[in-house]
């Protein structure tokens, strides 16, 4: 245990917290251009074809981000908005693409949790 004098000379080091989404640079969202849109498989024990896109951001970072929801209209050179948030079963995917913003359309025929997928409210059938 250090003496008070030792602590005055050299205070205790503060623990630095490492960012889980460094490419965001403390922004809530970032804009970028898709450089590659493809599917990848999750790690064990899950099995699927997850839709992901490699995105070059306006700040120069190139990140892999997840495209949530059923179906999408993304292709190379699409402009997208990304937010933080990893996908647990896809290593290296630390960002999500925001649905219904810029070039990415919302999920069609979505009834529940619509705001998460950029879906407008359905018209009431009279």
Curated annotation (Swiss-Prot):
GO cellular component: small ribosomal subunit
A GO molecular-function annotation: tRNA binding
Keywords: Methylation, Ribonucleoprotein, Ribosomal protein, RNA-binding, rRNA-binding, tRNA-binding
Record InterPro entries: NA-bd_OB-fold, Ribosomal_uS12, Ribosomal_uS12_bac
Keyword Electron transport in record: no
Gene3D superfamilies: Nucleic acid-binding proteins (2.40.50.140)
Biological processes per GO annotation: translation
Pfam annotation, one family: Ribosom_S12_S23
Cited PROSITE patterns: RIBOSOMAL_S12
Keyword Metal-binding belongs to the record: no
Residues that bear 3-methylthioaspartic acid: 89
Protein's job: With S4 and S5 plays an important role in translational accuracy. Interacts with and stabilizes bases of the 16S rRNA that are involved in tRNA selection in the A site and with the mRNA backbone. Located at the interface of the 30S and 50S subunits, it traverses the body of the 30S subunit contacting proteins on the other side and probably holding the rRNA structure together. The combined cluster of proteins S8, S12 and S17 appears to hold together the shoulder and platform of the 30S subunit.
Assembly information from the UniProt record: Part of the 30S ribosomal subunit. Contacts proteins S8 and S17. May interact with IF1 in the 30S initiation complex.
NCBIfam families in the record: rpsL_bact
Protein family membership: Belongs to the universal ribosomal protein uS12 family.
Protein's name in the database: Small ribosomal subunit protein uS12
Record organism: Polynucleobacter necessarius subsp. necessarius (strain STIR1)
């Amino acid at each position: 245990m250090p003496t008070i004098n030792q602590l005055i000379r050299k205070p205790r080091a503060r623990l630095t917290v490492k960012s889980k989404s460094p490419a965001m640079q403390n922004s809530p969202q970032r804009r970028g251009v898709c450089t590659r849109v493809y599917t990848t498989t999750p790690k064990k024990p899950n099995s699927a074809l997850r839709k992901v896109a490699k995105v070059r951001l306006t700040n120069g970072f190139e990140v892999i981000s997840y495209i949530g929801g059923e179906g999408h209209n993304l292709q190379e050179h699409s402009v997208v908005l990304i937010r933080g948030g990893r996908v647990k079963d896809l290593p290296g995917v630390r960002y999500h693409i925001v649905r219904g913003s810029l070039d990415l359309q919302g999920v069609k025929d979505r009834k529940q949790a619509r705001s998460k997928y950029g879906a407008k409210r359905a018209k009431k059938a009279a």
